[in-house]
Regions:
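C-terminal anchoring/interaction modules
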Residues: 2-6, 263, 269-277, 282-287, ...
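Intrinsically disordered, low-complexity boundary segments flanking structured domains
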Residues: 34, 71, 81, 112-119, ...
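Generic detection of long, well-ordered alpha-helical segments
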Residues: 100, 107-111, 119, 226-233, ...
């Protein structure tokens, strides 16, 4: 394993002395490198589709943008969703080999949060995920933390603590939260602090002690970020703004020749006549270059970025029949391979996150969860013809891979247990009636019954 050094978000703490820890924490926050943070914040702006104008406006003069607004595109979230297929369908979480509905009910919005977390982890290269318990609503809640500072003890590779900003305020009064875990008999800490290193107790925790003993923060780290997608989005935004300016200028720039400088400002319009001196001319000059070529150049930016990330783009003006499911699978083979490479990262993270959830629920006396936990990530499916789908379902039923209950959920995943039981009862009743009718049709009929039936 190669070690190319720690990032600016990793800080070494010399020892467990409380005062040294406090000084190190405060100093680390002040030494945050602006460039790395700025790049990350730009990526977040483009992912959440906010504040994108400011990243494009800097490449244009103020006069240009008085004529048209900037033209940013939602490239980054679309690339992130297309690339991160692991949580496209919610995974199944097993506890001692069974699904625990009690846990699923208390883990509020876990599936949607993990999906967004996976996309940001891929985009940023590293992302953190915090679990907390909402006592008022009696549920676990999750928070994605893109900007987190990690703290390490000398000689260790596992983080001892974390801090993150909670209130930017102004530049002189920023607020942060610090968590650390129990280590060598020393209780972990939990408190709020400011830029000067002054600590503040969080309500209900005057001792500033971590009640869980472990950090309620987990993380996923990729070998590299995907900032090339962000840069491509900026480039596409610049190009699209240029195209918008070109469209605005298609009518052309009014040009006069053969007139004095003092006459350069002339009122014009369909209800105004322009009197030109002898030898003077007036015309509109349009910019050269076709819009089609400019649009094709934008497509090249997008296509190249997609290829670099094992993706492909099917443009709206593409011709031909829609590809079949098998053809789509072949076209997506590189992305499917990337999905397989994502599994180890998130299996390990799911285990760490579960241990945090388990501990928090125990501390709040909500429930005790087993140690055995397993995540089954859903397989990627592609559209099939009706005939193919029916044959597949029948094969699964015939071979015991799917039950009638599974079949009902396949067509209606939102059915609750009561609806399922009612529907299964109807199916069983109809089946019994069919069997009875077949039996009656096969039984011999006596001469008397024939006479009675005929009458």
């Amino acid at each position: 394993m190669y070690n190319f050094g720690k990032t600016v978000n990793q800080v070494v703490i010399p020892d467990l002395s409380e005062q040294i820890i406090l000084k190190t924490v405060a100093k680390a926050e002040l030494e945050f490198k602006e460039k790395e943070i700025a790049e990350k914040m730009t990526a977040l702006d483009f992912y959440y589709n906010i504040n994108m104008d400011k990243h494009i406006e800097q490449y244009f003069s103020s006069e240009s943008l008085q004529q048209i607004p900037t033209y940013p595109s939602k490239v980054v979230p679309r690339f992130a969703r297309a690339r991160m297929m692991l949580y496209k369908s919610p995974p199944k979480r097993y506890f001692n080999g069974e699904i625990n509905d009690d846990y699923n009910n208390v883990a509020y919005m876990l599936d949607s949060q993990t999906k967004q977390f996976s996309e940001l982890s891929w985009l940023l290269g590293c992302c953190h995920f915090k679990t907390k318990y909402n006592q008022m609503k009696e549920r676990l809640e999750y928070e994605i933390l893109p900007n987190v500072k990690e703290y390490y003890l000398e000689g260790e590779s596992h983080p001892y603590g974390y801090s993150y900003e909670i209130d930017k305020g102004n530049k002189k009064d920023r607020q942060y939260v610090f968590w650390s875990e129990d280590r060598d008999g020393t209780p972990g800490m939990h408190f709020r602090f400011d830029q000067k290193g002054k600590r503040y107790a969080i309500a209900g925790n005057e001792d500033m002690v971590n009640p869980f003993g472990l950090n309620p923060i987990s993380k996923v780290v990729y070998p590299s970020s995907s900032y090339d997608v962000v840069r491509s989005a900026i480039q596409i935004g610049i190009a699209m703004t240029e195209i918008a300016l070109s469209v605005r200028n298609r009518l052309g720039q009014p040009v006069f020749t053969g007139i004095d400088e003092g006459q350069s400002v002339i009122k014009s319009g369909i209800d105004s006549a322009i009197i030109l001196p002898e030898g003077g001319t007036f015309q509109y000059v349009s910019p050269t270059g076709g819009l089609d070529e400019m649009i094709e150049a934008v497509k090249i930016f997008a296509n190249q970025t997609a290829e670099n990330n094992h993706l492909r783009i099917r443009w709206g003006d593409s011709t031909g029949n829609a590809p079949s499911g098998e053809a789509l699978k072949i076209l997506e083979i590189e992305n499917l391979e990337s999905r397989e490479s994502d599994i180890p990262y998130f299996k390990e993270w799911e285990q760490t996150r579960y241990e945090i959830d388990k501990r928090i629920l125990e501390v709040y006396n909500v429930m005790t969860l087993p140690d055995d936990y397993y995540v089954d990530f859903g397989e990627i499916t592609y559209p099939m013809s009706v005939d193919q789908e029916l044959k597949m379902l029948q094969w699964k039923l015939d071979n015991g891979i799917m039950t009638k209950r599974d079949l009902l959920l396949y067509f209606n995943p939102d059915m609750n247990d009561q609806e399922l039981e009612e529907k299964l009862g109807e199916v069983a009743e109809e089946r019994n009636q069919e069997v009875q009718q077949q039996r009656e049709a096969q039984e011999p009929v006596s001469q008397i019954e024939r006479i009675l039936n005929a009458g």
